[in-house]
């Protein structure tokens, strides 16, 4: 799925929640994007990571194409561990702050929220310390992710 499609889908979901008079819940995907932006000091859009390599974005398979893609695999595995603990990582929100050294979890006491916050902060910091290779954006996963 293209990043623009994800934004449209997100906008439709938020609109439907508003139309149903249900207060919109902050979505973890949106929060994770803010954590990423904090970690890289606004140098790269979080959307750049939505379709990178074999693991950044929806799904994931094969061998990561580089260290940045490996960050996404580790993040996927971390969410998998959270799910095994009975958590719903894509739905949970948490308190975090953006300090001079990047994002950090702030006053997160609930087990699941803490786990998800730790997963997201670790991934965002991993993204920030590894090089982004434009050649690994929007790759043919059927050919390169075996």
Swiss-Prot record:
Chain's role: Snake venom phospholipase A2 (PLA2) that inhibits neuromuscular transmission by blocking acetylcholine release from the nerve termini. PLA2 catalyzes the calcium-dependent hydrolysis of the 2-acyl groups in 3-sn-phosphoglycerides.
Catalysed reaction, written as an equation: a 1,2-diacyl-sn-glycero-3-phosphocholine + H2O = a 1-acyl-sn-glycero-3-phosphocholine + a fatty acid + H(+)
Disulfide bonds: 38-98, 54-145, 56-72, 71-126, 78-119, 87-112, 105-117
GO molecular function, one term: phospholipid binding
Taxonomy, superkingdom: Eukaryota
Cofactor(s) this protein cannot do without: Ca(2+)
Annotated active site: 75, 120
Propeptide residue intervals: 20-27
EC number(s) given by UniProt: 3.1.1.4
Cofactor binding note: Binds 1 Ca(2+) ion.
Species annotation: Hydrophis hardwickii (Hardwick's spine-bellied seasnake)
InterPro entries named among the record's database cross-references: PLipase_A2 (IPR001211), PLipase_A2_Asp_AS (IPR033112), PLipase_A2_dom (IPR016090), PLipase_A2_dom_sf (IPR036444), PLipase_A2_His_AS (IPR033113)
Annotated residues for binding of Ca(2+): 55, 57, 59, 76
Pfam family, one: Phospholip_A2_1
Tissue specificity annotation: Expressed by the venom gland.
Annotated GO biological process: arachidonate secretion; lipid catabolic process; phospholipid metabolic process
Signal peptide: 1-19
Family, per entry: Belongs to the phospholipase A2 family. Group I subfamily. D49 sub-subfamily.
Gene3D superfamilies: Phospholipase A2 domain (1.20.90.10)
Compartments in which it is found: Secreted
Cellular compartments per GO CC: extracellular region
Annotated CDD domains: PLA2c
Protein's name in the database: Basic phospholipase A2 73
Keywords: Calcium, Disulfide bond, Hydrolase, Lipid degradation, Lipid metabolism, Metal-binding, Neurotoxin, Presynaptic neurotoxin, Secreted, Signal, Toxin
Xref: PROSITE patterns: PA2_ASP, PA2_HIS
